[in-house]
Amino acid sequence: MSPNKHNLIAPETALIGRATSITPSLPHAVNGTILNDEKPSNYSEIIIGMGCFWGAERLFWNLPGIYSTAVGYSGGFTPNPTYEEVCSGKTGHSEVVRIIYDPLIISLEQILTLFWESHNPTQGMQQGNDIGTQYRSVIYTTTPNQLTYAQHSKQCYQQSLEQQQLESPITTEIEPAGTFYFAEDYHQQYLVKNPNGYCGLGGTGVCFIPL
C-alpha cells in the first residue's frame, strides 16, 4: 500500500535502499563545475527544498557568488534512493538543491530571501499542484550560524505573511543537514537541457523583509 502523500513514512517502514550511490558523471551544465568535488575552502554549503527541484535549482545557478548547484534527495531514511523511490513517498526524502556559494559575494540572507519569496512555505507536504512528502519546504544547514539565521528568517517571513493577512503557519522544516544523495544525471540542471520543461514554482507575492 502506498503511504499517505501528506504524512512522512516511519523510519522502520522506509525502503531499505542500497549501498551503491549515484555519482554524477557530467559536469554542471551551466558553469562546468564537477558536481561531486569537495567544495573549495572558505566556501559555504546549504541545502534547500521548495517543491520540484528542477525549477528550484534554476533560481540559483546563475547568481553571482554561486559556485555550484546540484539536485538530490535529503531528509529521509533510505540510503542512496532513486528518483522513483523518492516519488513513491517510501523514503522520507525531499527533493532538494545543494548550493555551494562564496559568502563574500552572496550572503545567506540573499539566498534565503529568494527561497522564501519563490515558493509557498505554508503548504505542508505539497507545493502547488505537486503533492507528496518529497515536495515539502526544507532548509538543511551545515553550520550553527546558518541554523540560527534560517530559524530567524522563518520568523521574519511569518511576520511578513501575517502583515499581508496571510496567517497560515509556515511549515518549512529547518534542521542540520544529514546526508545529501545526488539525483540521477537526467535531473541535474534539467531546465537547461529542457528549456520548456515543467516548473511548478510559485510564491505568495509577499516580500521577505529582514528584521
Swiss-Prot record:
It holds the Pfam family PMSR. It comes from the Bacteria. The keyword Oxidoreductase applies. Its EC number is 1.8.4.11. SUPFAM superfamilies: Peptide methionine sulfoxide reductase. GO terms for cellular component: cytoplasm. This is Peptide methionine sulfoxide reductase MsrA. The lineage of its organism: Bacteria, Pseudomonadati, Pseudomonadota, Gammaproteobacteria, Vibrionales.
